Design a protein with these regions (language model features):
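Mid/C-terminal beta-alpha module of Rossmann-like enzyme folds, strongest
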Residues: 106-168, 181-192
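Conserved sequence/active-site signature of Rossmann-fold short-chain dehydrogenase/reductase
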Residues: 23, 60-62, 99
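Substrate-positioning beta->alpha
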Residues: 66-68, 86-108, 115-118
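A short C-terminal helix-loop "cap" of Rossmann-like NAD(P)-dependent dehydrogenase/epimerase domains
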Residues: 72-85
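Conserved beta-loop-beta element that borders a ligand/cofactor-binding pocket
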Residues: 19, 40-64, 69
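Structural signature of the Rossmann-like NAD(P)-dependent dehydrogenase/reductase core
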Residues: 14-17, 53-59, 92, 118
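Short-chain dehydrogenase/reductase
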Residues: 28-39, 61, 65, 69, ...
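NAD(P)-cofactor binding segment of oxidoreductase domains
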Residues: 1-15, 33-44
Length: 192
């Protein structure tokens, strides 16, 4: 609401909103619900003020990202076994450079006005596969131990109290929905 007010007050006619894949006001997690609510508000009231484009990327990776680095840092403290919650959740990681280029190219593209783009990389990985790629990159000998759904939820509950909250109930709830594109726009970005 504040952003729309500022845009109106300053005669800004273009808004690029980065949301999240699976954003939905009725989504399974607080994160996805708030992303969905923001999108809905923006598309309902913002169109009167500016040309809006919404981008919904799957998980974003690149230099100093929060997703890959979170697991990389956790693996630094892991001797040989890594218990992994929500190991079957699927992602289509998007490289930040590819995402940035797509966003920049849409700025003056009138065909993107009013559009919502679900953005994914070319490959689908399970969370387990992503963590195994990180382990391989770190040249570590760590075995990933997939947790059951109930153990995943328990891990999330416990991790809520760990400093930095590396995994939370809200993360667990978000992981109940795969972060992949179906027939929507995807572009090339390579995790490997």
């Amino acid at each position: 609401r504040h952003i729309l007010s500022a845009c109106k007050a300053n005669n800004i006619k273009r808004i690029l909103h980065i949301s999240a894949l699976n954003a939905d006001s009725k989504g399974p997690s607080h994160y996805l619900r708030t992303k969905g609510e923001a999108e809905s508000y923006l598309m309902t009231y913002g169109k009167r003020i500016a040309n809006i484009t919404v981008f919904r990327p799957s998980v974003i990776f690149g230099k100093k990202d929060s997703f890959i680095l979170r697991f990389s840092n956790l693996l630094n403290y892991t001797p040989f076994l890594f218990p992994l919650a929500c190991h079957n959740t699927k992602f289509s990681p998007v490289h930040i450079d590819e995402l940035s280029n797509f966003i920049v190219n849409s700025i003056k593209d009138t065909k993107s006005f009013g559009e919502v783009y679900n953005l994914c990389g070319p490959k689908v990985y399970s969370l387990k596969e992503i963590v195994e790629l990180i382990i391989e990159t770190k040249n570590r000998n760590i075995k990933v131990i997939p947790l059951s759904n109930s153990m995943s939820k328990l891990q999330a509950t416990i991790m809520e109290f760990v400093p930095g909250k590396p995994f939370s109930i809200d993360n667990y709830n978000s992981c109940q929905v795969d972060s992949t594109c179906h027939s929507d726009h995807s572009f090339y970005s390579d995790l490997e």
